Design a protein with these regions (language model features):
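Residues forming the flavin
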Residues: 2-448, 453-455, 459-468, 472-498, ...
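Accessory DNA-binding and partner-docking regions appended to nucleic-acid-acting proteins
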Residues: 425, 461-463, 471, 490-495, ...
Length: 562
């Protein structure tokens, strides 16, 4: 007997099949695409720049902090600047690579224990107008990094940005600020300050929570000679501004225990505060594909396990560049990322039979060790920043901006106040009681507090939520698992996701596909006409749409309920 409501055989059409798809046109992605295409492999190179300004407004994929100028909405101008800022795109295009700009990868799918209907592994792609599926034989993930964001009083104001967000805006000449305070004095912080000066910005402060500055002393002196003032043993007391935008930052000195020293406040005029405390590898697509990830604090967090060709445990999937680990070498020099890209591109070509093994091995030997080079662990440093911010700013600071979840609500495992919901039972619980129930994880906290459930999809709060959980549990942050990732991994409008007319199968079987209770009624015992069935799931016999369920709910075949 055939179940007409089954989804098997009803998948959306696959528009194209490509032997090798590269996601991310940074140093690693471009190098991989060039290596493979020169071996005779058909290559598609995907990059989401120029970004949809609506995504930028949601701080996706970087923390832009509403500091984009109006030029960011001029797509033709932005396309020109993206190509100008990345000469590798032109080289790839001339070499025969199919370069897809302004395209986001919102999903990655392959057959597995719970999914068997796909013809092969596919990517979900989208631009501002439409969405489509592309099948691949080999895939390289070169998606780079995310900004690590740790909050402070006033961090929800426009003008608080991340190092990646600032770098993207200045590189494409759409940054709408002038005076910049940088948080963090390590290689990333110093590089951010240097690039800001080169872009014609004024760097009014570099702030460091530790007593010792962390970056290269030579570069530190150079910046100081150019008028940059450094503030060791300081943290942010508050970002201030009367119009919802940053107008100044107040710093406060810390003692050896990271406690604030009363009367040591310093207010500095600025319109932008840049978080340059660190970066985290972008592993969402790798997680979707089931690649094995392991925690490495010296590489920025969870990173993929790779073999000698930078292949992952997911069949046919490679990883290269910053998404395999962030360390000092990659911050200072993208040559490491380029080497990784070449190696991964060569590995993909070899696995496709496009290059003989002897030649591939020779090139790999020439490249030498291009894997991630360990540096010092970073999470202890981030914990210093978080602890100092809690001591200075307290628990009424947002831990999650999108859902307006405060630190107090996170620790108390309470939903955000805007919901107007209270439960005496839940009020008696908190992280402490959850810990007694078993290992804690971010998915659990997301469901109970909504932290990480907003449109930025946890990009602004993921690390600080993990740090909070580790602090409360008294465990290393590496024991806090990553949250689950599900498609779409980019905010996506329904109009873009499915612009076509609703197919007949969806019209006939939406009751089953959308998880309505009657899906459990066997299809051979009754047929539910979706157009004639209204389902109400309110509690206590009350319809969710007002009135009583007796008045509005039709009898559902096979349930015995009226």
């Amino acid at each position: 007997m055939i179940d007409p409501s089954s989804v098997v055989g009803k998948a959306p059409p696959i528009e194209r099949r490509v032997p090798f798809v590269v996601v991310g046109a940074g140093a690693a992605g471009v190098a991989a695409a060039l290596e493979a295409v020169r071996a005779g492999v058909e290559v598609m190179l995907i990059d989401e720049n120029p970004l949809d300004p609506d995504l930028m407004a949601m701080d996706v994929p970087h923390y832009f902090g509403q500091r984009m100028s109006l030029s960011a909405r001029n797509r033709a101008l932005m396309l020109e600047r993206v190509i100008e800022a990345n000469p590798g795109l032109g080289r790839a295009d001339e070499a025969g690579v199919d370069v897809q700009l302004g395209v986001s990868v919102w999903g990655a799918f392959r057959n597995g224990p719970t999914q068997r209907e796909l013809a092969g592994p596919v990517l979900g792609l989208a631009n501002e107008e439409r969405s489509w599926l592309v099948r691949y034989d080999r895939l390289l993930i070169a998606t780079g990094t995310r900004d690590v964001v740790l909050g402070f009083p006033g961090w929800q104001k426009a003008g608080v940005v991340g190092a990646n967000g600032l770098a993207s805006l200045t590189r494409h000449r759409v940054f709408a600020g002038r005076q910049l305070a940088v948080l963090g004095s390590g290689p990333l912080g110093l590089q951010t300050a240097r690039q800001a000066l080169e872009a014609g910005l004024e760097v009014v402060a570099v702030v460091e929570v530790t007593a010792e500055l962390r970056g290269d002393p030579v570069e530190t002196r150079r910046l100081a000679d150019q008028g940059v003032r450094f503030y060791p043993s300081h943290t942010v007391q508050e970002a201030s501004g009367r119009t919802g935008e940053v107008e100044s930052v107040t710093l406060i000195r810390l003692d050896a225990d990271l406690a604030p020293i009363a009367g040591s406040e310093t207010e500095i005029a600025c319109d932008t505060i840049c978080l340059a405390l660190g970066l985290a590898p972008n592993v969402e697509l790798l997680a979707l594909l089931g690649a094995t990830l392991r925690f490495r604090s010296d590489l920025g967090g969870f990173v993929p396990e790779t073999d000698g060709w930078l292949g992952t445990s997911a069949p046919g999937v490679f990883a290269a560049g910053d998404c395999t680990g962030v360390h000092e070498a990659l911050v200072a020099d993208d040559g490491v990322a380029r080497g990784q890209g070449r190696l991964a591109g060569l590995g993909a070509a070899l696995s496709l039979g496009a290059v003989d093994r002897a030649r591939a091995e020779a090139v790999r030997t020439e490249l030498g060790g291009v894997g991630a080079r360990p540096s010092e662990p970073v999470h202890a440093y981030w914990r210093h920043w978080l602890r100092s911010s809690i001591r200075v700013g307290g628990l009424e600071v947002y831990a999650c901006q999108c859902e307006e979840v405060t630190r107090r609500e996170l620790i108390g495992v309470q939903p955000p106040r805007y919901l107007g919901w209270h439960s005496a039972g839940m009020s008696a619980r908190g992280l402490g009681t959850l810990l007694r129930d078993g290992p804690i994880n971010q998915d659990q906290i997301k469901r109970l507090t909504r932290a990480g459930m907003g449109p930025c999809q946890g990009r602004r709060c993921r690390e600080q939520v993990a740090l909070f959980l580790a602090e409360e549990a008294g465990v290393p942050v590496g024991q806090i698992p990553l949250p689950s990732f599900r498609a779409p991994v980019r905010p996506l409008s329904l109009q873009v996701l499915w612009p076509r007319d609703e197919p007949e199968a969806a019209r006939d079987h939406w009751v089953s596909w959308f998880g309505i209770p009657t899906q459990f009624t066997p299809h051979w015992t009754s047929h539910v006409d979706a157009s004639e069935t209204t389902v109400f799931m309110g509690l206590g016999g009350e319809s969710q749409h007002g009135g009583s369920s007796v008045e509005k709910q039709r009898e559902l075949p096979g349930t015995g309920r009226g």
